């Protein structure tokens, strides 16, 4: 008899149904003890499949299931709301400058101020996440900065305008809590995509506000308010959104997959760390500072663009206020796809090439985006300028997504503070580029854009120096030292021998075990031992 083994009939392992873990197995038991074991399974309480740290191995953006997907949605929506507030003034600058008699220098300094405050708040947020949890950090940032958003309605001059924009910018610290929250909720194999979606959809608030604020301004004006009164009333909208999100985060959020940080610390399930130790291991790791520079030349540029792009199209191409807002909004709206794409590309590259693939992906996206930034500044017609802006936005935002496919692996113990330092790099880069290129009459806005692109190309080069002994770098292979080439050694080195004896490092060891996928498929397959019969053990 001839047997026809087709793909439709089965695949390798079908003769051992239920053994290979590739098939669905149907079974039931009437034994009470077996039912008890199933109900006691610690992973049974999760809606998504999880790893040994109870971090989700699947990403389902259409779900709001607790705790993983709920934390994801609360994180990005909080950041989205804060982005709207921070850049709410930018599309209304043509009206505000006439009302407050602002000069180009005043507007430029206010733009610098709007992102400079977050340099400090993001550093603080990193420590808050490590020590208190992402839920409190996010909610405090939203609620404490909401009054400053309302205060914009009562500004009377240039100094008040600058001061209020500086204080509103503190809320951008929610980016750090957002990325930290998703990093502790999702497995490393999908962290690039998840962080890309969370950060990208949050960044999209910079585009939405370019549409929202002119629309709200127009509606209020139609209701009978004067232009100089309408822009002031409009700021009650983003302030109200922050209050609502703060309440939702406190009432619905959860710090970690197994519960809130304070509760787990009291029960002894999670150790309570010291700020001095967390801070030390973050600042002494040179990779942290390279990420600081890299994010300053990707996210920093994006923040700068949010402040200048609407006015650039309004003045250079004589567009109407609402039209300029629509064009400018397209830059920020690209985050919906571009940043998640960058994170997903990082994950895909890691599956084959490991961490080295993530680093190459980051360098390619960031360099290409910077080159299109140069082109944007040299564009002489509206269609070419819009095309250059869109290509620039895709490259730069994809680079941001790819960068946070790397950042979660720099440290386990100081994850929050490293996220904070990296995020602060974005604000520092934005403040620096606005100060250098857009705060005086030395350069036109077009010249400033091109020079900013050149600066970004140069600042992307240090990615080549990021080297992990267990995974290698862009040009160098992993360490040949047997002990140092292990993930457990890298993450365990952040703990002293005394701390290890107390078992405080166990979370880092679990993280190390789940990070072996960063070796890449080729390395992983090469390391699988071959038994005497010559058949690889993974087949």
UniProtKB/Swiss-Prot annotation:
<dbReference type="InterPro" id="IPR036259">
    <property type="entry name" value="MFS_trans_sf"/>
</dbReference>
<feature type="transmembrane region" description="Helical">
    <location>
        <begin position="137"/>
        <end position="157"/>
    </location>
</feature>
<keyword id="KW-0812">Transmembrane</keyword>
<dbReference type="GO" id="GO:0042128">
    <property type="term" value="P:nitrate assimilation"/>
</dbReference>
<feature type="transmembrane region" description="Helical">
    <location>
        <begin position="418"/>
        <end position="438"/>
    </location>
</feature>
<feature type="transmembrane region" description="Helical">
    <location>
        <begin position="112"/>
        <end position="132"/>
    </location>
</feature>
<dbReference type="GO" id="GO:0015112">
    <property type="term" value="F:nitrate transmembrane transporter activity"/>
</dbReference>
<comment type="subunit">
    <text>Interacts with NRT3.1.</text>
</comment>
<dbReference type="InterPro" id="IPR044772">
    <property type="entry name" value="NO3_transporter"/>
</dbReference>
<keyword id="KW-0472">Membrane</keyword>
<comment type="similarity">
    <text>Belongs to the major facilitator superfamily. Nitrate/nitrite porter (TC 2.A.1.8) family.</text>
</comment>
<comment type="function">
    <text>Involved in high-affinity nitrate transport. Acts as a dual component transporter with NTR3.1.</text>
</comment>
<feature type="compositionally biased region" description="Polar residues">
    <location>
        <begin position="530"/>
        <end position="539"/>
    </location>
</feature>
<dbReference type="InterPro" id="IPR011701">
    <property type="entry name" value="MFS"/>
</dbReference>
<feature type="transmembrane region" description="Helical">
    <location>
        <begin position="384"/>
        <end position="404"/>
    </location>
</feature>
<feature type="transmembrane region" description="Helical">
    <location>
        <begin position="289"/>
        <end position="309"/>
    </location>
</feature>
<protein>
    <recommendedName>
        <fullName>High affinity nitrate transporter 2.3</fullName>
    </recommendedName>
</protein>
<feature type="transmembrane region" description="Helical">
    <location>
        <begin position="359"/>
        <end position="379"/>
    </location>
</feature>
<feature type="transmembrane region" description="Helical">
    <location>
        <begin position="324"/>
        <end position="344"/>
    </location>
</feature>
<feature type="region of interest" description="Disordered">
    <location>
        <begin position="501"/>
        <end position="539"/>
    </location>
</feature>
<keyword id="KW-1133">Transmembrane helix</keyword>
<dbReference type="GO" id="GO:0016020">
    <property type="term" value="C:membrane"/>
</dbReference>
<feature type="transmembrane region" description="Helical">
    <location>
        <begin position="190"/>
        <end position="210"/>
    </location>
</feature>
<feature type="transmembrane region" description="Helical">
    <location>
        <begin position="76"/>
        <end position="96"/>
    </location>
</feature>
<dbReference type="Pfam" id="PF07690">
    <property type="entry name" value="MFS_1"/>
</dbReference>
<feature type="transmembrane region" description="Helical">
    <location>
        <begin position="448"/>
        <end position="468"/>
    </location>
</feature>
<feature type="transmembrane region" description="Helical">
    <location>
        <begin position="233"/>
        <end position="253"/>
    </location>
</feature>
<keyword id="KW-0534">Nitrate assimilation</keyword>
<feature type="transmembrane region" description="Helical">
    <location>
        <begin position="166"/>
        <end position="186"/>
    </location>
</feature>
């Amino acid at each position: 008899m001839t047997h026809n083994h087709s793909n439709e009939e089965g695949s390798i392992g079908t003769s051992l149904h239920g053994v290979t873990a590739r098939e669905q197995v149907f079974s039931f038991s009437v034994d009470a003890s077996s039912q008890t074991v199933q109900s006691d399974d610690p992973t049974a309480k999760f809606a998504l499949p999880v790893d040994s740290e109870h971090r989700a191995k699947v990403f389902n953006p259409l779900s709001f299931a607790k705790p993983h997907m709920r934390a994801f949605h609360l994180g990005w929506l909080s950041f989205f709301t804060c982005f709207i507030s921070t850049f709410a003034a930018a599309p209304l600058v043509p009206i505000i400058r006439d009302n407050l008699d602002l000069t180009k220098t005043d507007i430029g300094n206010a733009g610098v101020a709007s992102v400079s405050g977050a340099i400090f708040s993001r550093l603080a947020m990193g420590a808050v996440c490590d020590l208190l949890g992402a839920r409190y950090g996010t909610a405090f940032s939203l609620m404490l900065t909401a009054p400053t958003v309302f205060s914009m309605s009562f500004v009377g001059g240039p100094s008040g305008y600058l001061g209020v924009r500086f204080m509103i910018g503190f809320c951008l610290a929610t980016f750090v809590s957002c990325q930290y929250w998703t990093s502790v909720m999702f497995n490393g194999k999908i962290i690039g995509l998840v962080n890309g979606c969370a950060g990208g959809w949050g960044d999209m608030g910079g585009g939405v506000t370019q549409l929202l604020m002119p629309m709200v301004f127009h509606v209020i004006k139609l209701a009978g308010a004067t232009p100089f009164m309408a822009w002031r009333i409009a700021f009650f909208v983003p302030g109200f959104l922050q209050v609502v999100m703060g309440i939702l985060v406190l009432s619905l959020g959860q710090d970690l997959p197994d519960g809130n940080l304070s509760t787990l610390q009291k029960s002894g399930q999670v150790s309570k760390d010291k700020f001095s130790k967390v801070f030390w291991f973050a600042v002494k790791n040179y990779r942290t500072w390279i990420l600081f520079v890299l994010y300053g030349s990707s996210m920093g540029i994006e923040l700068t663009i949010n402040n200048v792009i609407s006015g650039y199209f309004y003045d250079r191409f004589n567009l109407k206020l609402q039209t300029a807002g629509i064009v400018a909004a397209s830059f920020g709206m690209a985050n919906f796809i571009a940043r998640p794409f960058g994170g997903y590309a990082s994950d895909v590259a890691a599956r084959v090439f490991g961490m080295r693939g993530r680093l190459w992906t980051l360098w390619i996206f960031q360099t290409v985006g910077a080159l299109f930034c140069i082109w944007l500044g040299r564009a002489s017609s509206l269609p070419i300028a819009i095309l250059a802006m869109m290509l620039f936005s895709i490259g730069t935002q994809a680079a941001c997504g790819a960068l946070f496919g790397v950042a979660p692996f720099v440290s386990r113990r100081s994850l929050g503070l490293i996220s904070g330092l990296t995020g602060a790099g974005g604000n520092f880069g934005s403040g620096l580029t606005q100060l250098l290129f857009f705060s005086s009459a030395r350069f036109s806005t077009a010249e400033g854009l091109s020079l900013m692109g050149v600066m970004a190309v140069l600042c992307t080069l240090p990615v080549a120096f990021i080297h992990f002994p267990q995974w290698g770098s862009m040009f160098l292979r992993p360490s040949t030292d047997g002990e140092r080439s292990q993930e457990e050694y890298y993450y365990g080195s952040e703990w002293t021998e005394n701390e290890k004896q107390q078992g405080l490092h166990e979370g880092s060891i679990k993280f190390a075990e789940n990070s072996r996928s960063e070796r890449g498929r080729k390395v992983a397959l090469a390391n699988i031992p071959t038994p005497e019969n010559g058949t690889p053990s993974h087949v």
